[in-house]
Amino acid sequence: MIDGSGSWALRLRNGQAVFDEFMEAAPFPISRATLARRTGLSKPTVSALVSDLEDAGVVSLIPPETSPGRIGRPAAPYALVPDAALVVGVDMGATKVIVGVADLLGRVLAEDRIETASHARAAVDAVVGSTRRLLANLGKGRLLESGCVGVPGVYRPRPDRVEMSPNLPGFADLPIREELSERLGVPVTIENDVNLAAVAEAEAMDDRGGLDFVAISVGTGIGAGLVMDGKLYRGGHGAAGELGSIDMSGVADDRAGRLTLEDLASAPAIRKRFRHAVDNDFPSRLARDAEVSEILLAASSGDEAASEALGIAAEAMASAVAWLSWFSDPARVVFGGGVGSNPIFVDAVRSRLEHCLDETPELVASALGSRAAFMGAISTARASVRTTFVRGRLGR
């Protein structure tokens, strides 16, 4: 780190370094001496920057504890003020939208769930309306600094469009990042929802399994987020992980032509396969229009129609995981989404995968469940605050 205060750019850079240390230490306090040691800045420079951040309401002094008989003045630590800025995270799914406002520690202060409209434009309007309502209820509308929205498709920064989103149409003519940033008044990041789920899963892991793993979301659609060497892998065109589109025509004994993984293993596919089994006289104790959770539970107890539906879905998913394993050799596969986070589904995939690979990755159901993408959006919005917040506060 270069010390000094000879230029505005240098002051911002140094302020950024100090703010980053406060973010890393939060919620615990940190002393100016420790900040100087970690950043490589001089103590006078650190003291000046901490004073500026304190004046801006970003950090606050924590009164030091005194002990009887102590000689000398104890160090005066400072801590991040959690609600000095707020972020909004959004999971824009095919069946629901989750909108949440969080503080700088990532604590969700307010949250809203909205049934997804059938068009992307309506979903964007719902996100804006919900965000404004949550901020108004909190009484902190002016503190919003950043946002992140997870979308069920591939985001192309140029020309600011979402593609490959069959389950939520209408993105083709919608400059989503530009519109959301303008309407919310803060920078907004757009990211694939399963990539965000992978970000959240990586943060939740406390072992080396978080360095090389695949997060697979199985719900209305199917997608994957790949983490390699601890970094999210997007591919050359941002479309890495579009697992639901791969050809699985050889898995099912159908004459319907080309079948994708999504055609065989998604929630709608499992329901459709179950109805087909019932119509073809497979015994079942369930109603023909049973929910996927009911189908999976019935399959675990031997229901023939339910077992047929789950078996085909699990066989297709095991083939896809085998393909991913040959390609990227993940240490772990984390299943999320409404179907994927069900242990019955994971167990069924595991039993079939063992016949495909000599060494199988660890298969686990997500501990975050259906909130993984939302939590990843909060995390990403917090990360982007680091690049925008100091400039705005030190410039005031």
Indicate where each model-derived feature is located.
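Phosphate-binding/catalytic loop of phosphoryl-transfer enzymes
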Residues: 90, 104, 143-150, 154-260, ...
